[in-house]
Amino acid sequence: MSNQELLQLAVNAVDDKKAEQVVALNMKGISLIADFFLICHGNSEKQVQAIAHELKKVAQEQGIEIKRLEGYEQARWVLIDLGDVVVHVFHKDERAYYNLEKLWGDAPTVELEGVIS
């Protein structure tokens, strides 16, 4: 599976659980961590967990290794490392505080298909 296909798989999974303000950043040449960051938020702890759980389920169904999953229990900022794609699922109250889009402001955004934010 290509990095772009992995990104789209993640986008579809978070969108399925109604993640809001879904943004993908192209990190190629900017970060050694991943090629893409996918950033979104949920409006409650339960929704944040549902988004993370759905992504984990979909990844496992596709045989994609989850290298790391952090923050699930607190559901304020869940990080799901899929290798070339790192997904950040924030609680809406935390997203503005951490403002990853501004922190990584030199990273271009990626056009996403099928997402209504």
From Swiss-Prot:
Entry-linked InterPro entries: Iojap/RsfS/C7orf30, NT_sf
Keywords linked to the UniProt accession: Cytoplasm, Repressor, Translation regulation
Superkingdom assignment: Bacteria
Molecular function via GO: ribosomal large subunit binding
Subcellular location, principal: cytoplasm
Residues forming coiled coils: none
GO annotation, biological process: cytosolic ribosome assembly; negative regulation of ribosome biogenesis; negative regulation of translation
Pfam families: RsfS
Similarity-based family: Belongs to the Iojap/RsfS family.
Gene3D superfamilies: Beta Polymerase, domain 2
Single GO cellular component term: cytoplasm
Subunit structure: Interacts with ribosomal protein uL14 (rplN).
Entry-linked NCBIfam families: rsfS_iojap_ybeB
HAMAP family, sorted: Iojap_RsfS
Organism: Halalkalibacterium halodurans (strain ATCC BAA-125 / DSM 18197 / FERM 7344 / JCM 9153 / C-125) (Bacillus halodurans)
Localization terms from the record: Cytoplasm
This protein's encoding gene: rsfS
Function text: Functions as a ribosomal silencing factor. Interacts with ribosomal protein uL14 (rplN), blocking formation of intersubunit bridge B8. Prevents association of the 30S and 50S ribosomal subunits and the formation of functional ribosomes, thus repressing translation.
Name used for this protein in its record: Ribosomal silencing factor RsfS
